[in-house]
Design a protein with these regions (language model features):
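Hydrophobic N-terminal alpha-helices or hydrophobic patches in metabolic proteins across all domains
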Residues: 1-118
Length: 118
């Protein structure tokens, strides 16, 4: 998850966020969805609800980051489609179900639908 935040954060920091979209990537020949999220408490970004609402230069920075960070490992990554908030939520749920099937013996059960709020 790439967290858009106006403050610097240490790697592996836990932050309460909401998804705004994802970028489809081809990473080492495999599909890889990069979830983009925003902290609830971030004053710069927390007015954005969907990745499509962000300024264009933010997309350029993210695409550049995702394509060059793998180059340091001698690997190739290609940025693809940009997807909205609802698509990101579907990807997250699929990943949770896959994890539950692999490690918990069954899919995650959704007792109630989350609110449309962030």
């Amino acid at each position: 998850v790439l967290v858009l935040c106006s403050e610097a954060m240490d790697p592996l920091t836990l932050v309460r966020c909401y998804p705004v979209g994802y970028i489809s990537m081809l990473d080492g020949g495999k599909n890889d969805e990069k979830i983009i999220a925003i902290p609830f408490s971030d004053p710069t970004y927390n007015t954005y609800q969907d990745l499509m609402d962000l300024p264009g230069h933010i997309f350029d920075e993210m695409a550049h980051f995702f394509t060059v960070y793998k180059a340091l490992e001698g690997k190739e990554a290609v940025a693809g489609d940009v997807n909205d908030r609802q698509a990101a939520i579907r990807v997250i749920r699929q990943a949770m179900d896959h994890y539950a099937e692999c490690f918990l013996g069954g899919p995650v059960r959704q007792e109630s639908q989350p609110s449309s709020d962030r």
